[in-house]
Amino acid sequence: MAYALFLLLPGCPITALALAGYGLGRHRLRQADRQARLRSLAALAGAVAAAVYTVGLLALTLTILDAQDNGADSSPLRPCRVAGHPERAANVTGYRVEYVPLRFVCDTTDGDDYSADAVPGWITPVAAGFAVAGVGCACAAAVEGERRARRGAAAA
């Protein structure tokens, strides 16, 4: 499951840069119509969502590297150690990575699991919020284009 990081870690920043370039690269945006502005805003919102998700992926990658360290003080897994609850960490059998929401999950011997504080809590809501805003702006741009096409067809 952690192998998806090999695709996501380089893919998310490239996507963020491409969307930011599209959103900011519109010529004469001040004179542009509403549809072009909405498309640019959708691209910028998508760029922010991808950039924030990249920050979470970096935090998750560092946590995985810490969990894979097999030196002294590696058992129980360092990311699974919870302050004030040493008994939880003593029962950890392994871990898994979840990408939506972005988190590092520690599995225990009794079949239970808990999320380690590896990824900051603000990453998933901010990334999801900007992604939803980007999709909303893209849909609004499509509706605006359809309205303009209908007005043009009615005038002709």
Which residues does each predicted region cover?
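Extracytoplasmic/lumenal ectodomains and periplasmic regions of secretory and membrane proteins
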Residues: 67-99
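Juxtamembrane interface at the cytosolic side of transmembrane helices
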Residues: 19-44, 133-156
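Membrane-helix interface/capping segments
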Residues: 28-31, 61-71
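Membrane-interfacial loop-to-transmembrane-helix junctions in polytopic alpha-helical membrane proteins
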Residues: 3-7, 31-41, 116-119
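Individual transmembrane alpha-helix segments
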Residues: 97-130
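C-terminal region of N-terminal signal peptides and the immediate post-cleavage residues
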Residues: 1-5, 54-67
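Internal/C-terminal transmembrane anchor helices
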Residues: 36-59
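Membrane-embedded alpha-helical segments of integral membrane proteins
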Residues: 1-22
